[in-house]
Amino acid sequence: MGLQALTIEAIAARAGVGKQTIYRWWASKTDVLLDAFVDDALSGIDPQDSGNLEKDLRRHLTNLSKFLTQSDAGAVFKALIGQAQNDPQLAEKIRVRFTASQRQADCLPIVKAIERGDLPRKTDVDAIVDSLVGPIYYRVLVSGAPLTPAFIKSIVEHFLASIKT
Amino acid sequence: MGLQALTIEAIAARAGVGKQTIYRWWASKTDVLLDAFVDDALSGIDPQDSGNLEKDLRRHLTNLSKFLTQSDAGAVFKALIGQAQNDPQLAEKIRVRFTASQRQADCLPIVKAIERGDLPRKTDVDAIVDSLVGPIYYRVLVSGAPLTPAFIKSIVEHFLASIKT
Amino acid sequence: MGLQALTIEAIAARAGVGKQTIYRWWASKTDVLLDAFVDDALSGIDPQDSGNLEKDLRRHLTNLSKFLTQSDAGAVFKALIGQAQNDPQLAEKIRVRFTASQRQADCLPIVKAIERGDLPRKTDVDAIVDSLVGPIYYRVLVSGAPLTPAFIKSIVEHFLASIKT
Amino acid sequence: MGLQALTIEAIAARAGVGKQTIYRWWASKTDVLLDAFVDDALSGIDPQDSGNLEKDLRRHLTNLSKFLTQSDAGAVFKALIGQAQNDPQLAEKIRVRFTASQRQADCLPIVKAIERGDLPRKTDVDAIVDSLVGPIYYRVLVSGAPLTPAFIKSIVEHFLASIKT
DNA sequence: CGATAATCGAGACGGTACGTCGTGTCTTATC
DNA sequence: GATAAGACACGACGTACCGTCTCGATTATCG
């Protein structure tokens, strides 16, 4: 069931390789996955910027939703994040290798909006981005509720409304 | 490292019990944990209501943060949620046994505010609650960023600002 | 495989009886078998005596052969004797409950012949009987060689020849 | 109590070896014993031949008695033969690996005597050897009666007397 | 004839050993 | 000289039975 169904012996056998060769290059099963996952996952991150904050946010959150729920990489990500709950070292590795880059993309629409002057200079980017992507991750990892366009729309609208004041 | 360091044999030995007795009553290691966890976790949920939405939200989110980061039950919850990423059946069990109740408590401040007339009848409770608790879970499960009072304050203020319009 | 495939739980279940009821009356699995076996095994022993030593011996050894190789009781006997190699107490019980009676029957032709005066008074009955039945048991328990009429004839003839001198 | 007191786990532990290593090389507990037993048991078989049939037979039967009742290998042999009563495959293995060689030694005095001309060419070696060793095995495996020099002497004398005619 | 035991089936219990699987390390034989 | 193949010590798995121990339900005995 999940990661423990994926044995090192099976990986080696499937690769037509001795176990030792695996151990020579990776310290653990999760490291193998992390390496295999990071490359194609990072390539899927979109650095687009249309100049329209609402549009950018909706597109970005939609892409994030699709990554998490529909892509193979997203499935691996969930598996790794799951494993990381029991393994702080893995958690750190995921952050360094993947989450940091993903985070930059998450921040991009906000940062660009600040540069444009659409948002005030003193905006707390971190808190805002967490408020935008947090609900997405929550539904994926915890509640299992579906990520509908309406939900994404609601997140973005609440955010935009909150900064109108 | 986490759940696989907790063997059934150790559980049985520690309980002064034969392995078979564990297997007789629980189908898996996670079921044992789920049973042991649910009782004391649910008891920690607070149904308080002061009549002040902002105050209630901050208190509730603060309690949630403490549960997730500082309590034993929270640690078990993280481990279970982690395992659930590889195991849809476990995910479902967690929702039925625990998340559902937790969710009710999460919704309470909003529901009460609606009853009071502080929020409009047509408020989408689910989307709003996800937006409030989502960022908390995100930091705990994914980013590892700290749950400061300032962060909680920021979440609540953005929400309140968004509904002022 | 043999006796350890016959579990107490299976015996109890097959008899529609609680395990405790078995344990109340028998101390061990072999005791159950011993009881079940002794009755019908003893009833098969023939105390006939025709007055003709050769004829009696051949008939007796033939019967013994059939008992050991063709009857259900013989199969149980082999199983019990097998178990007894590892269990002196069982060995003793088998002797008291069964082998002793069997032995009397084995001795009968010789004893009768002595009474008749066909054999000298000082005949060592035990040694002679062992020499007669020993080869039979040897083939059954050890060598697996078949118990042909010719073999039985050979045993008897050698014995009769040996006492002619 | 015998073989079931000798667990695979104990064998492995005593050998400072993982259980798997045992299972890799032997299919069952009895196979382990058989291998361990055969080597030193075969080495104890004596191919001596003095040219005197009576002397050779007495010496051989005496050695056989000592092997069965006084040596460690004899104890293992009895345990294996016991187990073999419930396990035809084991019975066959014992015959191939051990009994066959033992049998050759058992036959030797008779065969040599025939070569010497002390016994007729048409002698039925198998039947005779069974008659000689059968009583020994019978006392060991079934009756438990002691193997005295007098008993062995009686066996040999009866045999020699029977061929005098 | 109804209360009171004794006996029984059922099966949970603390244990022990089973045979299997996967781990990470070490060795061999091949290319 | 690197590598596939796989043996090795180890430890947890989930299963099967062991012999002991409660449980009701069902009999049988006696008041």
Show the residue positions of the predicted features:
Chain A
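C-terminal peripheral helix-coil segments that are non-catalytic and often amphipathic
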Residues: 59, 100, 108-115, 131, ...
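Amphipathic alpha-helical packing segments from all-alpha helical-bundle domains
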Residues: 55, 71, 75, 88-115
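Hydrophobic alpha-helical connector segments
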Residues: 45-77
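Short, basic, alpha-helical segments at the C-terminal edge of helix-turn-helix-like DNA-binding modules
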Residues: 37-43
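Helix-turn-helix
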Residues: 1-31, 35
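Tryptophan-centric aromatic hotspots in well-structured domains and transmembrane helices
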Residues: 25-27, 94, 98, 133, ...
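Amphipathic alpha-helical segments used for helix-helix packing
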Residues: 31, 36-37, 69-93
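All-alpha amphipathic helical-bundle segments outside canonical DNA-binding/catalytic cores
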Residues: 93-98, 115-130, 149
